[in-house]
Amino acid sequence: QDNGFKVRDEMGGAVDPDGLKEIEAAIPDLVEDIKFLSYEDADLQRLIEKFDASIDYIKHIKKLIDLGPIKEAGLMVVVDSMWGNGAGWFTRLLKGGRTKVLEIHNERNPSFPEMLRPEPIPPNVDAGLKFSKANQGDVVLILDGDADRVGIGDEKGNFVNQLRVFGLLAYYMLEVRGERGPIVKTLSTTKMLNKLGEIYDVPVHETGVGFKYVAPKMIETDALIGGEESGGYAFRGNVPERDGILGGLYFLDMMVKMKMKPTELLDVLFSKVGEHYYDRIDTLFSGDREEIRNTVKNAKPETIGGLKVTSLNDTDGFQYYLEDGGWLLIRFSGTEPKLRVYCETTHGDLVQAILEDGLRIAGLK
């Protein structure tokens, strides 16, 4: 159920929804109509080109970021590669200096033991955080299975949620590197980005959920940074696609340039935009999808979690904007029988109440 493949366009970014529909329309309906060719036969017919992409990738990375100061910073960097293809990359890129890199789950293993899924979100991150705490890590970099997403753990062994990481990376681009350009965000990620946009006078573009919406908008606007709620971030100068290795290196560079640990970086961010809290619930459902959708559509709540609802956005699911500048989003998974309920608020004590109200609105509580 988890197998599949990704399609990328000539820019290296996700194909937009219209392009995906064209590709899907060309897929034969019957398996017997598909032509098969073994790897061995394809290799003999010279239909497969083999090359080492790492050489050009490393050259490209070094054009985007000076690794020297990170190597000499004397950091203890813990990396959880989650048994995926990000294994060994940070060790390779940062060797030869005072900074040490300790890796766990750094062998490729498609069964992904010790975790529910190779995603850099709780509870999958717990092993890396525990290992870092035991080894006095300054930061934890957690890559997903294909290393296009990155999660962060702080120097105390606590997880830094993806919305806060997005806010920090945008702040780094705008303040530390002094760059300017649009920010592209999915509607399921943080409003801290909108506040940073106002402070630094850069436009913020909001899209539907998924990089199939983010990548085209980044190309269209020549965006400085783009990202989504799941921990995927893309940067100008790179392909318009998520890159967990580059995101991790930029985070380390921010620590080095600002001479701060992750908790201190968050304090700086919050001094600019205020403290924001986030959580999400994924719940399986067995009923009719349209029935649940209509239940949400007809709910029209006046308050959620005790906060007044100010407006509704139904671009991709149902997003209720709240009086504190926060939001609740209710939307279906595109691939599974799951309802996702997300929220962000400036009131840490209201997060669970907001999420529970979201389930009630959907008729699932």
Predicted segment positions?
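Active-site microenvironments of hydrolase-like enzyme catalytic domains
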Residues: 1-10, 143-156
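Short glycine/threonine-rich catalytic loop with a Thr-x-Gly-x-Asp
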Residues: 143-145, 159-164, 239-243
